[in-house]
Amino acid sequence: MKNNQNIIYIRILSLLIFSFWFLPVSASEQLIEFSGYIKNIKNKKPIDNVSLTVEGTNIGTVTNDDGYFSLKVPANSLPTVLKAEYIGFQTITIPLSLKSNRSKIVNLFMTPTGKVLKELFVLGGDPKEIVEAALKKIPENYSANDNLFSGFYRETVKKGNRYINISEALVDVLKKPYKHRNTFGEKVKIDRGRKLLSPKPSDTIAVKLMGGPYMPIVLDAVKNDEHLFSIDEIENYEFKMEPGALIDDRMHYAISFKPIVTMPYPLYSGVFYIDGDNLTISRVEFELDMKDKKKVTNSILQKKPSGLNFKPIEVSGVVTYKTINGKSYLDYINSKMRFKCDWKKRLFSSTYTSQAEMVMTSRTDSIDRHMKFNDTFGSRKIFSDQVDNYWDENFWKDYNIIEPSESLEKAVNKLRKK
């Protein structure tokens, strides 16, 4: 069958456009599944991307766009406590117990922090100096050991409001100590995956993301000083103190940054959320400067068909970190790109949204002996093209994932019926 799709290739924070040792739970280990919704107690609206952690373990996940989560916990870890934290809300905890062998429904309500952050403004300080001090304290505040994470990865592409690509993976991520702000020796290995694609013949343009599962290495803004900026490049940015925020019941500075110099490539603006006590960077939000669309296009677009106009709209992301026993670890990453495509001499264009996210679901101290180079996933590989190599019919079994949102689940069910 002839493939008439045109293909666009994009890197993690770039695109490709065409014409069209994982850490599983032991099989003998009993799991208890806890699931439910997390909502704002004031307006009863769901809260997405809430970080959930089972205390006493390295098990965790995040809520989906509907505020829903499910978490599989080994029975021998119970009783314990589930902790939920999100920026701007008071952290909450709820006991988890082993009352039966069935799944448990746990619905939680979180309270906005309101005006409890006035102490941060009393602290004051120069925002630039605070950021510089936080960068210098990275070796002290973050893991000093090799860590092997288990993670769940999902990438999606939408044409307008319709999903045309959904790919998911269970991954291993090897992270090196944070005493050096580089990515040397860090690796990603895919354990299993699955893909769902729209079969519509009208989808004449296919969007492919390069290096998607590699994002915990490239987009770790604390570890990778080439992503945003290093201490030596701090003079290239303007910093401003914004209203503070509460994260995990700890007061945080919110310091925005934007470039004040012009480079041959586009720079980022964004916000650092820095612990007011120990200067740990708990959250980073970033967005690529879109003033020079040509620079942005050169930065993110790897390949496209001739005759196709590509217009970037948004390149943004967020990275969060979780503190356990005094050290912070990578927790969640989300990267989003929006752009328009149209063929020359045609009146209408289509808007595409490419999104990739990964949550770290468990962690152990490890060394690099179990991850061979030939088994790793590189920054230039296209996961959606290779996902079938990792297919497993028991994809969901015994693993913690980001539950699909209602709109995503509907898209999946619709594709399955065709």
Q: Locations of the language-model features?
A:
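Structural motif
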Residues: 30-47
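Extended beta-strand-rich segments in extracellular/periplasmic secretory proteins, especially
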Residues: 225-275, 280-288, 322-323
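Short, acidic Ser/Thr/Gly-rich low-complexity loop/linker segments typical of extracellular
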Residues: 58-68
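Hydrophobic beta-strand segments
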Residues: 50-54, 67, 82, 122
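Short strand-edge motifs at loop-to-beta-strand transitions and within beta-strands
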Residues: 69-71, 104-106
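Surface-exposed, low-complexity/disordered segments
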Residues: 105-237, 248-251, 300-301, 305-418
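Short Pro-Gly-centered beta-turn/loop motif in secreted/extracellular proteins
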Residues: 71-78
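A short, solvent-exposed loop/turn motif at the edges and junctions
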Residues: 83-94
